């Protein structure tokens, strides 16, 4: 139907612009509502603008320029990438994952508050969800800060003794957001 097709078009443009509006199915679920609200707020558009044709002009402009505002991951590889994010909250670092970043796409994860620093880890996966390897080394993007993750969906605030608790100790990169209006981490084949 026309309403579902229109919403699927909005979802698709949001995803291209770096917003997390998956799945692209024309159904207005919680993730789609949050992505639309965030887009409208960041672009300083009225809440009812989504019902107007002008929203498509704004979405197309955002899709052409995903660097607009906020933090985004962009995938320049031929593989899907699974990414996880860390941020400071009430004196500790909270890690959350996994975000799927399709080849050639960008995702703007939802950040709480206005952090000056985030922590990022990602790995390329094959069609079965297994980590892509180059020889014996995973095709991944991280750093040196060890934080806990798990294989399935997670949100964790305690990063002591990851292995003893059945979690993975994962090396995150520290990303300084500073006062920049936009920060993009690009995943490239190494």
Regions found by a protein language model. Give the residues of each.
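Cell-envelope/ECM-targeting effectors and their regulatory/trafficking segments
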Residues: 1-190
């Amino acid at each position: 139907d026309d309403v579902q097709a229109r919403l699927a078009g909005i979802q698709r443009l949001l995803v291209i612009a770096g917003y997390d509006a998956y799945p692209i199915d024309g159904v207005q679920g919680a993730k789609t509502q949050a992505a639309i609200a965030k887009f409208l707020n960041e672009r300083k558009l009225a809440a009812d603008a989504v019902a107007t044709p002008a929203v498509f002009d704004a979405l197309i402009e955002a899709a052409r320029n995903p660097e607009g505002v906020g933090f985004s991951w962009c995938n320049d590889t031929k593989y899907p990438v699974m990414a996880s994010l860390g941020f400071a909250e009430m004196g500790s670092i909270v890690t959350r994952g996994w975000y799927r970043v399709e080849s050639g796409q960008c995702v703007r994860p939802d950040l709480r508050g206005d952090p000056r620093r985030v922590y990022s880890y990602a790995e390329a996966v094959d069609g079965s969800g297994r980590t892509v390897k180059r020889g014996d080394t995973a095709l991944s993007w991280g750093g040196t800060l060890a934080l806990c993750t798990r294989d399935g969906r997670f949100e964790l605030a305690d990063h002591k003794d990851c292995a003893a608790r059945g979690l993975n100790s994962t090396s995150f990169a520290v990303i300084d957001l500073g006062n920049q209006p936009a920060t993009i981490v690009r995943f490239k084949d190494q």
